[in-house]
Amino acid sequence: MEFDTKIKIVLREDLEMWQKLNVTAFLMSGIAGTQDIIGQPYLDKDHVQYLPMSQQPIIIHSSTGERMNELLEKALTKDVVITIYTEELFHTYNDEDNRAMVAKFKTNELNLVGIGLRGKKNQVDRLLKGFDLHK
């Protein structure tokens, strides 16, 4: 199956493993909840049904926090959807507090630990050119 869009997640390289997994899950929930990317439910041989997942592959990159802020600035000028996760969200425990915490910072002052992007392949690839794949 060929897609004209691409999904990429960028994680700050100094995060603990549990943080990387947590941030990736939250960022993908934002993309999956607002974009038409979810496939059909899965059925095993016993006909047990499981929830559907993204139809598209998801590519994970790593970066410094500073470079992530530069990426966000550029991404805001392109036709891509963006989801973010900031350092402060590790200390909040619900959506209302999460949104309030993000609202305390100007865009260029966000303490980014993760960014999720979805858009046309060529735009997303250009934005992430030179970013290392996560290891």
State the predicted function of each range:
Residues M1-K135:
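Positively charged, small/polar-rich N-terminal and surface patches that mediate targeting and assembly
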